[in-house]
Amino acid sequence: MNSLSHTLPPELDSALQETLQKWQTSDSTARLWQRDASLWTGADEAEWLGWLEIVQQSLDGLNDVQAVIRTMLDDGIRQVVLLGMGGSSMAPEVLRDTFGCQPNAAELFVLDSTDPDQITNIDNALTLEQTVFVVASKSGSTLEPNILMAHFYHRMVEAVSAERAAGHFIAITDPGSSLEQQAAEYGFRHIFAGVPSIGGRFSALSHYGVVPAAMIGMDCRRFLESAQSMVSACKTTAGATENPGVMLGSIIAVAAHQGHDKLTLVLSPGIASLGAWLEQLIAESTGKQGTGVLPLDGEPIGAPDVYG
């Protein structure tokens, strides 16, 4: 399952082999997992690699997450609205669209816009007495989720009273954030901690993705254990060609260096929504210092010769 196959023209394949040899000679896989910032600029990169170990951390904390969700469902909650922007909302939306909301779980809405029509449409679909709002913001200071939280908190006060409104809110935020402080002051149902060393677009397998996934009834343990097997495959130092992460990254990099910097995403219908998350992940991660790879999601597929 954790493998990769590829076919490249001779000039790209030759460059790939050279790149893989350099990677292996410099022991770069081991250095990556040791968070060696010299693989990049030698600046603060080591402080942003928490995603390397997050799968095991999420597995270790899964029972606690599921206990909170069980209590929520036992209290009659059947609708969840996630309020977030960018990486904090993208992964939950992909998981919902891919796996669906399971029976006896909650229905998930994702609101990542302050467009009045979108807010009204979701508002009209809710039974507030049976709804929990999940405010997902790493910094806690992102304007849009805070505006949405204020709006729906007011609506919840109207629906269930000021004393009970906070019990219909959950926060996912990094420790020490303004949202954590506000959620504690209000008495939110629960506060799930983010990991400061994980950027938003890398947070899919942390609480930002796992908590909404548990709410819709996903088999999160199976999901994370599957991810953990890929972690193991990407951690191997046996050889660069045996490491699917190194191989994929090297192919994309070699192609980009030779002018093939448009990456068309071709996805099966069942995982089509994954393209939007990959698009953000790749564009935001590689688009630095005037260079980068341009991912294209949802583009009509053409003949091979149109990709040059």
PLM feature spans:
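Active-site cofactor/substrate anionic-group-binding motifs, chiefly glycine-
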Residues: L73-V81, G86-G87, R96-E107
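Active-site phosphate/pyrophosphate-binding segments
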Residues: E158-G308
